[in-house]
Every structure is written in C-alpha cells, then in structure tokens.
Amino acid sequence: MRVKPMFGATFTDIAIWIYYPFNGPTKIRFGLLNYQLPHIGEHIGDWKHVTLRVNNFNGELQSIYFSQHKGGTWLDATDLEFQEGNKAAVYASRYGHAFYSKPGLVLDGRDGIGLRNDCEKDDLYLDTGASYTLVATEYLGSANVEPPWLNYRREWGPTVNHILKDEIDEILKVIPKPLRGHFRKFFYKLPREILEEEGPSSIKTKVNWDGDEI
C-alpha cells in the first residue's frame, strides 16, 4: 500500500498494489465468435492496482481508480458496489487482472471486436483491509521505511519471445475469409502489454507512483 497527499493535501490517495505471479493468455471476441489465443498475453508477473481517493475535509471516499490494460478508469463513490458496509468491491478480469467495478463482460474494443475482460462474483475474495503492508508514506519523514524489494528497478519476470506472426496465421485459419483483414488490423492495435511476453516493470518507476493516475 502506498499513501500520498494529492492536490495540496486536499485529498489523500491510497494506492493498493497487488502482484500476480502469472498473467494468462488473451481471449478475444470477434462478433459472435470467441477465440482463445494460445500464448499472446502470457507473461510471468503482473502488477495491478486500485487507488482510493479520500476527501481530507470530511474523511469520505471520493472515488476509486481501477487500473486496466492501458491506463484505467476513475469512478465516483456513488457508482461503486459496497460489501459489508463500507468495503468497495473490485473485480479482476480472468487471466489479465484488469480491474472493474462490477462483474460481467467488458469488451476492450469497438463494433463487437475486442479483448474480452470477464469478471465473476465469487465466495473467494481478497480482503485488502484485513492484511496489508505500508510500503511508501514519504510524508511521514523518517517514519517512512521502504522494504528493499520496492527499489528493485528491473522487470519482475523474464522476457519470452514468441513469433507473433505465426500465432496470428494459426488463428486466421479458423476465421472466415471476409473477416481476416479486420482481425489482423485489430490484432496489431492491442495494448503493448498484451502483445509482449515480458515481466512488468517496478511499480516505483511508473508515472502514477508520484503523480496522478493517467
């Protein structure tokens, strides 16, 4: 957990970072058809986070930022689902771990073509308020003690090289010919983190570590 003042201490941002050991392969939707890609999107290690923005004047939750594959989304507290009183519910997508405020399918694309983000409600969940570690609270001065791993600046996982063209060609074999050109264009517009099988960078090197969420 990383806590920092924002906008002249008008708000306090509480960023909750979660490390996933493995990111699974991507699944895409093409009209009424769904395709599970064999390897694309896989990589060892995956950092994702949600940020709670608290109003320092009244101590109330103002909004939550849900990190996703490319950037993320801010939602006002009035648009969130709460459980057990004041605990906001966050849903992680299957394999990709993109965060959303409700279960169901979110299609990352347009015109019925895109990356599937499937979320489901389950009895198994992670209560981040029950067990957490404060890793960065610079405003506390000398009381701020960072764990050694926080300053590890290299990738949190190996780089695995696959020949993307070969994988695309295999998928094109099962896609109707009139749709193949559209699929190829869509494929190369996927976020970089989906196409590359590379471990994630250190969370401390990310732009939003010190600044606002973008």
Residue ranges and their predicted role:
Residues 4-15, 21-214:
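Domain-length functional cores that host ligand/cofactor binding and catalytic or interaction surfaces
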